[in-house]
Amino acid sequence: MSNVSPLKIDITDGRLPVKEKGLVFQEFANPAEERRNQLEKLAAGFRLFDYFGFNEGVAGHITYRDPEFKDHFWVNPLGVHFSQISVSDLLLVNHDGKVVQGDKDVNVAAFAIHSRLHKARPDVNAAAHSHSIYGLSLIHISEPTRP
């Protein structure tokens, strides 16, 4: 043990009021306003994935359930790098795999994974899947990894 005198620090100083803690859920006037806000966040999410290295090739996708058309979801197009995705690139896809808004091709793997997820879990509004170089390297190891 050290002979240093403990500091008297008020750890409650500067705390946020309870109402400002945690996630802040926004309220929107209509579904179109909510959609635009969430699509901007979705596009930003792709850029964050790129920034943090979850951008290996074209493997990976993030989806967002449409607030008005609950059986549709927004997804990134095939072949557009995460660092370049903007709201105008995003595709609205129905559960049959048809692109109902957007002019690019949908990633078949993204549709296969996310359509099942969104169907099975109506309480889930967004999902992400990526192939990081670290995760990919683990699948190429010939012997099992140890805990």
Identify the meaning behind each predicted range.
Residues 137-147:
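Residue-level detector of conserved catalytic or cofactor/ligand-binding positions
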Residues 2-126:
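Long, non-catalytic terminal segments
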Residues 80, 132-135:
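Short acidic/polar capping segments at secondary-structure boundaries
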